[in-house]
Structures are given as C-alpha cells and as structure tokens.
C-alpha cells in the first residue's frame, strides 16, 4: 500500500496554482492546457501541453516548471525528452510543424545572494530546448514503449524489473572537497579520494578533506514506490546497484 506525506505535496499544489495564474494571461494565438492523444504500436500516448503559441510558420511548445535553481543549472534530459514527445504529438495529431520548444522555469528557491557563474539571473527563466527530428522522436517513443512493455511483463511473471540508469535516478556521485579550516567554500572539489589527497598536499596546512556522500535525488525525494524497489534498497544499504 502506498503512503504519501501531505507535506510532500506542497510544491505540486504551488505548481498547479502557478499554472492557473499563467493560463489567464493567454493571447489569441495561444492554446492553453490541451491534451493530445495518439496510438503507437498499440499503446495509447497522450500529453497535456501547457502552452502552444501558434505562428504562421509553426508552433512553439512551452511547458511550465516550478523547480529548483539546481535543476536549471544542470541540464535535465527529462525535460528535453518530455517536450520532444509533445512536439511529436502536435505534429502527428495536428499535421502542423513545431518550430521551437522551451521551458518556463519558476525557480522556487532563487536567491540573489547565491548569484554565481551559471546561476539563474532571475526567479523566472525561459530555457530553450533542443528540437529533435521527427524520426528521432518516433524512435525514442518506441524505445520507451518497449521498456514499459518489458517492465509490465516482468511484473506479470514475477521477474526482476529493469534497473533505472544513473540519469533516471538523478544520481550525484560521491565527492571529496578540499577546504580551509574555518572556511565556507571548497578550494577544490574532486571525484576521487586520491585526487583530493593530492590537492590537500598542495594546499598546505590548515586544510582538510570533507567527504560529500552521493545521492540518488529522484529516488530519495520523488519516487513513491522506492520502498518496494530492490535497486533502491540495495543502494540505501550501501551495496552496489
């Protein structure tokens, strides 16, 4: 039986409220909150598209995201995949070309004092997303259908489920930071302990190594079925998974 703490739903509710506000600002050439459907290899594919801007030479597909500064600073392939599926749906169902994709990111933890290289310049940011070819989109959708079919078969036959990739789990590797005693920022951040020890020797006295454990952010904070997942349980127990 699945359980979810209601406090975990705060940002989802906030995101829904933001969508409602933005919907009221639509123009005549805007299509807001439209769900499109198509069938591929016997599977039903659908997507609720936040905004379509219809222009003479094509459609711009946009999606609103209430997200973190970290997510904006680090490319999320999930966003690219999602919007390209939307583009495929638009071109398949409407037979009109898609000319562009973008994310409108509402950054909930934006702070002026955190400004640094690559940090979002404002709490609202538009991010252009790469538009794949129609063939690339079709191949990706068929690949995902195949993965879902394999997982469904594994469940029905009581077999092990396919494991998620590091990208799918939003995995952050373990890091070793070389810091000065009493300092706040790291002088060096290393991917191996060996490299960190070398940097520590060069740094001289009054420096130390801070171990920063790795994390699978999506599993830890967003997956509602992690308690039933063998891969997560192995990882959480310190085993390789």
Predicted stretch roles:
Residues 17-21, 85, 139-144:
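Long, highly charged amphipathic alpha-helices
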